[in-house]
Amino acid sequence: MSSPTPFKMRLVHLDLKGAPPKVSYLSEVFPLFHALGANGLLIEYEDMFPYEGHLRLLRAKHAYSPSEVTEILRLARLSELEVIPLVQTFGHMEFVLKHAAFAHLREVALFPNTLNPHEAESLALVQAMIDQILELHRDVRWLHIGCDEVYYLGEGETSKQWLQQEQNSHAKLCLSHMQAVASHVLTQHPGVTPLVWDDMLRDIPQEQLKASGVPQLVEPVLWDYGADLDVHGKVFLIGKYQECGFQRLWAASAFKGATGASQALPPVEHHIRNHELWLQVAGSGPKDALQGIILTGWQRYDHFSVLCELLPVGIPSLAACLQSLVHGGFAEDVRLRAERFLGVSSLEIADTVSEGAGSFPGSDIHALVTQISLHLRSSVDTLLERNRYVTGWFSPYHRRRKLVHPVMIQHIQPEALSLLSRWNNLVQQLEVALQPVFYPDTIEEWLEENVLPSLQRLQDLLQDLGEAAARQPPPTSPGWDTGQNP
């Protein structure tokens, strides 16, 4: 018998700093999220938010309009999904600090990761961002203000001077900025409670945390995406945070985007195990210690990294993870329920994903991306590196010199043309499937990263073969000379 979930709130994270879906696709997946057991969304807009005024330059090319944000919120309400917006206010500020207009606010001049907390203009900047986001999210109960992975904090020139004073420390520097940002949220937007990622808090001594006043201002989100999550360590951390005075705590797991910056297919078994371990944490710690859990679905590791798993490709993993949370584990009956929701005949969690098509929104993308990711590069590798005619008679040595035995053209060319035709056909199908879901720049980026390098290798082989075939007279061996007399 499945046990009920210990997590009252179960939020799906939408990471919009890469491959942001069109609103029409969100209208299709929100009801599925709800059916699978989600009751909230953490929306990380990054450069997809329609910032105005001096912040307008933060907008991406295809940023949502204010009316589209309003529509997203309406669609979320229809599916009974409570929205928590997320805005980075300390680390991961690349989408802001990459711009020349804000580069002077970097903690380290060379790196756009982290905001300089000593500049009054830095605080004014994040306050303006918060105010614009909450202007369009008037009914929210929480705002996530980020504050994770604040790399290079303390390494700026102003910080180095500040840290030379005896009473100052990296922890104090971090907590003071967190306090300033959270205080702005609480004073200017009563009723909205700030959430923060917890990694910058973990190693701060208990007494210092308690004395900072931060536990009265924010609710930490304990994040761990591993399949080897330390249950006892997390239970200990929960106890530490509670003793410091934090009123509420949250957990964060991952259903995709946590196992490799260029990962194309989510390892479902890894993600299910991560959720099973979080269930153990919730069951081992104080009752109701965790307010809820955020199922993160990262789309880029940071603003400058490549895309990882696309949202439609991650939906089977999300289904398995949400159903695990709702039913207290991923027993056989839970697997069958997940398969019914997805319209798949088999959810192969031991493999990367199931290759079978489903009936969920974006299932055609899932099926095509799976085929391409599992077989495109390997099929080209097989032809170029293990086909005996290519390796024996049209090696890189031959190709550079445009040398080929005429009979080998008949052995190599038909197979290469057939392979190229097959993959071109599948890629065209994928482009058609991607167009209703994603904007053109996302499609271009995904294909250029995941498809074009392999297709280019095939095309280069065929071009070299054609040029070698056109040479007259054909050489008799790779050692064929130029015909000059000694």
Curated annotation (Swiss-Prot):
Active site: 149
Gene Ontology cellular-component terms listed: cytoplasm; extracellular vesicle; nucleus
Annotated localization: Cytoplasm; Nucleus; Extracellular vesicle
Group of enzyme by EC: hydrolase
Chief location of this protein within or outside the cell: cytoplasm
GO biological process assignments: carbohydrate metabolic process
Entry keyword Metal-binding: no
pH effect on activity, per entry: Optimum pH is 5.5.
UniProt EC number: 3.2.1.52
Alphabetized Pfam families for the sequence: Glyco_hydro_20 (PF00728)
Function text: Has hexosaminidase activity. Responsible for the cleavage of the monosaccharides N-acetylglucosamine (GlcNAc) and N-acetylgalactosamine (GalNAc) from cellular substrates. Has a preference for galactosaminide over glucosaminide substrates.
Quaternary organization: Homodimer; disulfide-linked.
Record PANTHER family: BCDNA.GH04120, HEXOSAMINIDASE D
Protein name in UniProt: Hexosaminidase D
Encoding gene (name): Hexd
